[in-house]
Amino acid sequence: MQSYQQPLRVGVGGPVGSGKTALLEALCKAMRDHYQIAVVTNDIYTKEDQRILTEAGALEPERIVGVETGGCPHTAIREDASMNLAAVEALARKFGNLEVIFVESGGDNLSATFSPELADLTIYVIDVAEGEKIPRKGGPGITKSDFLVINKTDLAPYVGASLEVMERDTQRMRPQRPWTFSNLKKGEGLQAVIDFIVERGMLGARA
């Protein structure tokens, strides 16, 4: 049986349209020259996110696997993560030297969490367009994720959201836990996410 190393598994969750796939695209493009990376995407009835990442050239196509969960996206990353666990293992065996596998959940609500059997680190993505109240609504995605990304800061003036209020509420809801504002269209906030993955994942910084 072919041997392989156990990669760091990073779960990326968040509501539909918050920017999970955009974050993954940016992470892959920024990290692929320094680390061996693969991605597992989750969609309920299609493999749309796999297609988006492939067409964007985030990674070589064979490094991106799409999983059709066929039901509640929450179940596929927590209660019954078997399909995702199988996809992760298949990628790890195929390449042998993977260092990071990102697992993107299907769009879900604030209660979404990853099974510890599936993800070593979790990143949760919300966006300003959902309203400034989102951080204080809480839920495991906000309070228990290892890293929180508040995306689309450029939309704040258009939706009447106060970034100051969101910052205050975020610090109150997840004291001592890291987070960042981001505008992924401009790459703002991306480095903070990378630094977190490298440091907490003990990957070792590489130029």
Swiss-Prot record:
Any single Gene Ontology cellular-component annotation: cytoplasm
Subcellular location: Cytoplasm
CDD domains: UreG
Domain of life: Bacteria
InterPro entries, sorted: CobW/HypB/UreG_nucleotide-bd, P-loop_NTPase, UreG
BP term (GO), one: urea catabolic process
PANTHER family: UREASE ACCESSORY PROTEIN G
NCBIfam families, alphabetized: ureG (TIGR00101)
Record text on subunit structure and interactions: Homodimer. UreD, UreF and UreG form a complex that acts as a GTP-hydrolysis-dependent molecular chaperone, activating the urease apoprotein by helping to assemble the nickel containing metallocenter of UreC. The UreE protein probably delivers the nickel.
Protein name stated in the entry: Urease accessory protein UreG
